[in-house]
């Protein structure tokens, strides 16, 4: 099995004297993994994803990403990122196509002009998320579920080898939750996925392993009893949805 991400003794804190946000975190992510990242608020889930994305630098330890030799990609373009929140001005008439096209910025040449391959990547990404007929729709007029799918398409426009998502099914209706999870399941055939979530009931069956983050990391390879285990967790009332809606 090919390693895609390797972390050893990872720790992070803000400033030289601040408390560790995470500490002693070690894990491996392999090609084809679909990993759920769970844990209480303040447990370090977001910090971990920022470290993987290269937006934060470890205070101690090491974290390495390994692109495939055939891809020839830099780290910043081998990882696609779908944030939980996307700030935009609802009065600005940006189209779905332009939002997805922004996912190609890391691929632009020095003169900064989009080429035919960039527009083809947008078409392909929108087709993957089932929005191929929404190119010219106004982004601000979409439903919550459609917005999440557009953000997923934006991440897919760079043809990433690794996809990281921060609670992509939060605050959207059950039909769109299921649609997004089904899309991710198909994408997992060719893409390694890490997904932060609080919703164990609807997502557990999609994961082949789970990372539980609460300052440090526990890797759980067997997800078959995961829901029962964490329904008894003291954070369940604030954090985890373990029963059907």
UniProtKB/Swiss-Prot annotation:
Membrane topology recorded in Swiss-Prot or TrEMBL: Peripheral membrane protein
Entry-linked Pfam families: ABC_tran
The keyword DNA repair is annotated on this UniProt entry: no
Positions with a binding annotation for ATP: 39-46
Compartment(s): Cell inner membrane
ABC transporter domain sequence ranges: 5-240
GO CC annotations on file: plasma membrane
Any GO MF annotation of the entry: ATP hydrolysis activity
Statement: the UniProt record of this protein carries the keyword Transport: yes
InterPro entries attached to this UniProt entry: AAA+_ATPase, ABC_transporter-like_ATP-bd, ABC_transporter-like_CS, Metal_Ion_Import_ABC, P-loop_NTPase
Keywords in alphabetical order: ATP-binding, Cell inner membrane, Cell membrane, Membrane, Nucleotide-binding, Transport
Coiled-coil regions listed: none
Role this protein plays: Part of an ATP-driven transport system CPn0541/CPn0542/CPn0543 for a metal. Probably responsible for energy coupling to the transport system.
Record family assignment: Belongs to the ABC transporter superfamily.
Full protein name: Probable metal transport system ATP-binding protein CPn_0542/CP_0210/CPj0542/CpB0563
Organism: Chlamydia pneumoniae
């Amino acid at each position: 099995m090919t390693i895609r991400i390797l972390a050893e003794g990872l720790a992070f804190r803000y400033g030289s004297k601040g408390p560790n946000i995470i500490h002693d975190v070690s894990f491996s992510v392999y090609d084809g993994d679909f990993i759920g990242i769970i844990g209480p608020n303040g447990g370090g889930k977001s910090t971990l994803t920022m470290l993987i994305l290269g937006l934060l630098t470890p205070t101690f330890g090491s974290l390495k990403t390994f692109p495939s030799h055939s891809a020839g990609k830099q780290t910043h373009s081998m990882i696609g990122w779908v944030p939980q929140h996307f700030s935009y001005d609802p009065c600005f008439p940006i189209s779905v196509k332009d939002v997805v096209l922004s996912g190609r910025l890391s691929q632009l040449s020095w003169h900064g002009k989009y080429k035919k391959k960039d527009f083809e990547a947008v078409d392909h990404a929108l087709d993957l998320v089932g929005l191929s007929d929404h190119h010219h729709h106004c982004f601000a007029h979409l439903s919550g579920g459609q917005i999440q799918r557009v953000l997923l398409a934006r991440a897919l426009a760079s043809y990433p080898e690794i996809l990281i998502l921060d609670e992509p099914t939060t605050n959207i209706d059950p039909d769109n939750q299921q649609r997004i999870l089904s899309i991710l399941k198909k994408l997992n055939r060719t893409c390694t996925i890490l997904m932060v979530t609080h919703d164990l009931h609807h997502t557990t069956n999609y994961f082949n392993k789970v990372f539980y983050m609460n300052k440090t990391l526990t890797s759980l390879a067997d997800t078959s009893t995961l829901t029962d285990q964490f329904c008894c967790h003291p954070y369940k009332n604030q954090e985890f949805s373990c029963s059907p809606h």
